[in-house]
């Protein structure tokens, strides 16, 4: 599956995520996760911080004019245009930004779709200013939802998700500190500081 060209899947995914009732039901049934946790995390973002949101999807996490929405998928960026006009189509492994550009980077529900999540975390850390925060959520292995994760991998929708401990290792290896991990169901929320 190539998220860059999967127009129908991208549109369907964004519709479900943006619909409160569908996202609540889907998150609970599929991942044993209360989507309200994600909405709370998004609501705590500082709208005055220069923030990179990647993959931004349809822009659900956009929180102000200093928010740069980035995604590999042109379909997702088109949908995010409803919330911001600061859009960048890019690959998460080679961000077109100078080192130490952003006060914060957020990556909600995207790392598990990647083949090299550790490399993505390292690249996000590169563009963070000293003292900046990286936060997000990702599906993780090591729960009773592993068979479903494997099925999504076989369909090419997911890349190589790790466990919560793998996530800690990736964040630490990228040079991040003050790491906080909050596993709930098959989702782990995380925050770390550069």
Feature annotation, model-predicted:
Residues 118-130:
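A short glycine-rich, Lys/Arg-flanked "PGG" loop and its adjoining helix->strand segment in the class I
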Residues 1-46, 60-61, 76-79, 135-158:
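Conserved class I S-adenosyl-L-methionine
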Residues 179-194:
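Core SAM-dependent methyltransferase catalytic element
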Residues 50-94:
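Class I SAM-dependent methyltransferase SAM/SAH-binding core
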Residues 104-116:
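A short SAM/SAH-binding and catalytic strip from SAM-dependent methyltransferases
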Residues 159-174, 179:
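Short alpha-helix
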Residues 93-105:
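A short acidic, Gly/Pro-enriched loop at the edge of an enzyme's catalytic core
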């Amino acid at each position: 599956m190539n998220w860059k060209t999967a127009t129908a899947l991208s549109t369907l995914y964004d519709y479900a995520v943006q619909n409160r009732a569908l996202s609540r039901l889907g998150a609970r049934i599929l991942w044993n996760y209360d989507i309200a946790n994600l909405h709370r995390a998004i609501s705590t973002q500082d709208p005055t911080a220069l923030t990179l949101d990647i993959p931004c999807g349809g822009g659900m996490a956009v929180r102000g004019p200093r928010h740069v929405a980035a995604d590999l998928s042109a379909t997702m960026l088109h949908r995010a245009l409803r919330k911001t006009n600061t859009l960048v189509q890019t690959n998460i492994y080679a961000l077109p930004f100078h080192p130490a550009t952003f006060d914060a980077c957020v990556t909600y529900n995207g790392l598990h779709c990647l083949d090299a999540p550790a490399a993505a975390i390292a690249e996000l850390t590169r563009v963070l200013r000293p003292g900046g925060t990286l936060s997000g959520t990702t599906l993780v292995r090591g729960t009773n939802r592993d068979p479903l994760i494997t099925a999504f991998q076989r369909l090419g929708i997911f890349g190589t998700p790790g466990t919560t401990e793998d996530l800690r290792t990736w964040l630490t290896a990228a040079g991040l500190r003050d790491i906080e991990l909050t596993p709930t169901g098959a989702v782990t929320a995380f925050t770390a500081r550069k």
